[in-house]
A protein has these predicted regions:
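Preference for intrinsically disordered or flexible, low-complexity segments
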Residues: 1-407
Length: 407
């Protein structure tokens, strides 16, 4: 992105945020006093390497980050324009998924998925789109999908899964892209007739990464034309050939109340080491760049909350009255900025919040043009409506640091 383009984009983002301030008082029922209090129970999410890789397969209903998604409905996964970045047109990358069933019969199994484009350039343009009030066709680089199933369904037993490697799901899944292991492999290599891709982009990347050499060998070893990967066995173990996927973690949960007890200064120091190692070089400059006391106050409250459990990467709310903790006062949505459900027209509520600490575990470089965010807050249909579409679009609000610091 050239300097002039960056400058124009920063000016537009600042103008949009300033225009939104007038709406904030009218629609946002969060005032300074409310920010000091949190009444609703919150569940914290932490990432850890799984003890057993098989535990992250779809039949175990995992909450996980990085790697490839474990599709709840393995057949009818998002396709066509749903799985690409609306800004650059490239397939989105899997960020994380959260298993969050409800008491509703239609949501006995319920999973939310978050995908995003790894390009910071696209995320900045996503900000421009985000500030538009409910466009007819939003252009986003961050997308959220909700999938839910009844207890009796074609894919899983009605009984609790047996946590051993021999437990298998009931039924096959769609054939996936051999490069990303994420999206449907609708495109077939015209030479070997075995390797599948979700897009021309991934086919080119795979060819350059080694399929050019492997393709003739595949033709010799598999002379019968047509892919034979129609069964579940290959699909369930598919991890994708791309080396650019984020590393795979299990998301474990704990109640925030466990961390609300007073900590000694020694414990505070030891518990803060991870976040400080990640942020010391950048947080001071970001803090100094804040415009006015409101941002500094929000940042201080945010840090105080995070310091109780600095390794947390996710905060789960799922309550109509829940409010996320915003690192910055600027760039927050008003109530009017949160759309209504696209399927039932009902209200959406805050489901969970993804913290920037996740980038540390993903090993994302701390460079000027590297992917970065201050917070990603996911809003989902309050009623968790059971529209006929297997994967329903939900809404993500991304707060980045001041545009000037994000660049």
């Amino acid at each position: 992105m050239d300097t002039d383009a960056i400058g124009d984009l920063v000016d537009k983002l600042k103008a949009m945020q300033n225009d939104n301030v007038e709406d904030q008082d009218e629609y946002d029922d969060v005032d300074d006093d409310d920010e000091e209090e949190e009444h609703e129970p919150i569940t914290l999410g932490f990432v850890d390497k799984p003890k057993n890789k098989w535990s992250l397969q779809r039949q175990y209903f995992p909450s996980k980050a990085g790697g490839v998604p474990a599709w709840l409905d393995p057949l009818n996964i998002p396709s066509r324009g749903s799985f690409v970045c609306d800004i650059c047109g490239e397939p989105l990358q899997f960020l994380l998924q959260v298993y969050a069933p409800t008491e509703q019969e239609t949501a006995f199994h319920r999973m939310l998925y978050v995908f995003m484009c790894p390009s910071m350039k696209c995320l900045l343009r996503d900000q421009h789109e985000q500030w538009k009030h409910h466009p007819e066709k939003p252009s986003r680089s961050v997308k959220v999908f909700r999938c839910q199933l009844q207890r009796v369904n074609p894919f899983y037993s009605q009984e609790c899964p047996q946590y051993n490697e021999s437990h298998k799901p009931a039924g096959c899944g769609a054939v996936l892209c051999d490069w990303c292991g994420t999206w449907k492999g609708d495109k077939l290599c015209s030479s070997c007739r075995q390797t599948r891709y979700c897009s021309e982009k991934h086919q080119v990347m795979s060819w350059r990464a080694g399929h050019k050499i492997a393709c003739p060998q595949i033709q010799i070893s598999s002379p019968v034309s047509g892919s034979n990967k129609s069964g579940a066995t290959l699909l369930e173990s598919h991890k994708g050939g791309s080396k650019n996927l984020w590393p795979e973690f299990e998301i474990t949960i704990e109640d925030e109340s466990e961390y609300n007890r007073d900590m000694s200064e020694e414990n505070k120091l030891s518990n803060s080491l991870i976040s400080r190692n990640r942020t010391d070089d950048t947080m001071n400059s970001i803090f100094d760049s804040f415009q006015g006391d409101a941002d500094k106050k929000s940042w201080a409250s945010f840090q105080e909350c995070i310091d109780k459990a600095p390794e947390q990467v996710l905060r789960y709310y799922r309550n109509t009255n829940a409010k996320p903790i915003w690192p910055l006062s600027s760039g927050r949505p008003s109530n009017a900025d949160i759309p209504r459900c696209s399927y039932c027209s009902g209200p959406m509520c805050c489901e969970f919040q993804i913290l920037p600490q996740l980038l540390y575990y993903f090993g994302v470089d701390n460079e000027v043009d590297s992917l970065d965010w201050a917070s990603i807050v996911v809003y989902a249909c309050e009623a968790s409506c059971n529209a006929s579409l297997p994967y329903k679009h939900e809404f993500a609000w991304v707060q980045i640091h001041s545009p000037s610091t994000a660049l």
